[in-house]
Amino acid sequence: MDIKKEHWSPLLLDWFAAHGRDLPWRDESPRDPYKVWVSEIMLQQTKVETVRPYYDSWMDHFPTIPALAAASQDEVLRQWQGLGYYSRARNLHEAVQEVQAKYGGHVPENKKDVQSLKGVGDYTAGAILSLAYGQKEAAVDGNVLRIFARLYDIEENILSTPVKKKITALVEEQLPDEAPGTFNEALM
């Protein structure tokens, strides 16, 4: 099989169906965009095993956008305590307050509006849009950059903007029309 020409996403999806981990933020179908968002922010620079109890506790305290938006920053930081990188919690809190005020508590369904939220970049926007809304959006993080660089024999610096764009285009070529979020999760 020539990996450069073959559309291999069905193989990855089959593998993920058999081997994907059972995680609390994957419990619902369709997925709640708020829960996807919280999990993705918590998982930045943090292992899944570490995040799991924090996520469960967070959802007990702030199960919805209105609940988090109404919380004080002190409450938010208290719930985040132990996860580190506290700017993630402050940014999430501020962004959720914006979603509550500007969008009536509904996470926007277009990339431009999602990316305008504090602390949300290309990866998180792609994850929210693909996982919660089923949109064909790539979620490319450092792990995906490394995987695709190996698969496609890319030797240039994967952190350079041109190479990131090249790899994102390759991911987009592989994204299936059905279940793009599942494909993104399988890559992660």
Language model: regions and residue ranges:
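Catalytic cores of DNA base-excision repair glycosylases
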Residues: 2-6, 10-11, 17-188
